[in-house]
């Protein structure tokens, strides 16, 4: 389970994701949103770093999820997922959003997963571990 934020902008992050990761982001972000919004009370993921980083920021996560769905549809792919409700512009962004080391770690992870595809963006991050945010 993972959300990918190579950039502070949700839209910019969505636009750079490859087909495989963008498709999964819609599903995984929705699953995380269900957990942090107390809709799905599963013990399996509640302490996962990709979940804990979004606690207290369900509106921001809904915005992220909707942005992934929007980009998916913009690319012409079939989408059966519903947009999530959110309180724009009233919500607060998570405090880690915009921290350079966070976005560098995501870029590094994406480069590791698909160097040919993500190399086109000119990212130069070394092989970094993802930073766990809680």
Describe the residue ranges of each PLM region.
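Phosphate/adenylate-binding glycine loop and adjacent helical scaffold
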Residues: 1-38
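Catalytic phosphate/metal-binding cores of nucleic-acid and nucleotide-processing enzymes, i.e., regions
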Residues: 26-36, 62-65, 72, 78-102, ...
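Polybasic (Lys/Arg-rich)
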Residues: 43
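Conserved, mostly hydrophobic/aromatic
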Residues: 48
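Conserved small/polar residues in nucleotide/adenosyl-binding loops
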Residues: 131-133
